[in-house]
Structure formats: structure tokens, C-alpha cells
Design a protein with these regions (language model features):
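Non-catalytic interaction/clamp surfaces of large macromolecular machines
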Residues: 1-22
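Short, surface-exposed acidic
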Residues: 15-26, 45-52
């Protein structure tokens, strides 16, 4: 899709393989902030459900619009491989550079780690704590499948407890 070229250029520029991009479910949210909302409405979701999911926000001027646009998208999965939120990296000069889904009933970034669903199955007894999404993905592609990252700038006690549940060495 030509609309996703900017995202694909970024990911291939970071030397990610198609296999790695597929494994992590990476994608691109286009510049039109209404596409996701329109798609979800067609699938039968109500505006309230879309807003509560954290994928969109309501503004008086624009109505219900996607939270993420012109961003490479990183699905955030729980330990059972269920998507519970998203991270998005802006393409270009926009701010913020990285944006996570807001806290929802199913997404609490303090209690989750990016990549833990894959690191847990590595069963190495070790976990490598990285700074962010791209670090985790690059480490996995290089064969270090026990890499994880916190979701945001703070590393929490809950995340430390998670690490200790799944690894002897950090």
C-alpha cells in the first residue's frame, strides 16, 4: 500500500526483516485520523467502545479521531499474546516522538513489559532489559529473544516483579 511507504521505509531503514515485522505485528497508521474510526464503525463497534479502547479520542472540533496517525505502530501484547494496547512512533518531526495507548481497563503500562510474551517462551533463565520497542525488536532479530522493555520512561516495581517471575537473571 503506497500510503504505508513512509512506515516501511523507516522499518527497513532500521534493517528489520519482513519476518521480524510480521512476528511483532508492526504496521503504520496513516495521516488520515478518521480511517481507523471508520473501519471500526463498519465492524460494528460503537463510538463509546472505540473511545474506551484507547484507539481514538473525542474533540469538540473534530469529533472522534484516531489517537494514532502518521506513526509506525507497535502492538503491545500481554503475556498470553493478546493485544492490550499500542505504541506509535511519529514519522517526521511531530510530537510526542513516541505515544502509547492511554490507560484502559485492559492496558496498564506499569504492569506490563514490551516483548515479555516472546521472552517468556525463550526459557533462557535470563532477561535483557532494553530501553524501547526498537531495541527489543532488534535484539530478537539478532537472536536474543529474551529482551524486553518498559512501557514509558519509568521502570516500575510491578515491572520488576514481573521480571523476577520469569527470569533468574536480569
Amino acid at each position: 500500500d503506497p500510503r504505508g511507504e513512509v512506515g516501511m521505509r523507516y522499518l527497513t531503514g532500521r534493517k528489520l526483516t519482513d519476518e521480524t515485522m510480521h512476528h511483532f505485528g508492526l504496521g503504520y497508521a496513516g495521516k488520515n485520523g478518521e480511517q481507523v474510526v471508520q473501519y471500526l464503525r463498519k465492524k460494528g463497534f460503537t463510538d463509546e467502545e472505540i473511545k474506551d479502547s484507547g484507539l481514538a479520542m473525542f474533540s469538540e472540533q473534530r469529533g472522534l479521531r484516531s489517537q494514532f496517525w502518521n506513526r509506525v505502530m507497535f502492538p503491545i501484547q500481554d503475556i498470553n499474546h493478546r493485544v492490550i494496547g499500542f505504541g506509535g512512533r511519529v514519522m517526521g518531526d511531530g510530537e510526542p516522538k513516541y505515544l502509547n495507548s492511554p490507560e484502559t481497563m485492559i492496558f496498564d503500562k506499569r504492569r506490563n513489559l514490551y516483548g515479555l510474551n516472546f521472552a517468556r517462551t525463550a526459557r533462557t533463565g535470563n532477561i535483557i532489559l532494553c530501553e524501547g520497542y526498537m531495541d527489543v525488536i532488534a535484539m530478537h532479530q539478532a537472536g536474543f529473544t529474551q529482551a524486553v522493555a518498559s512501557l514509558g520512561t519509568a521502570f516500575t516495581v510491578e515491572q520488576a516483579n514481573l521480571l523476577h517471575r520469569y527470569a533468574e537473571n536480569i
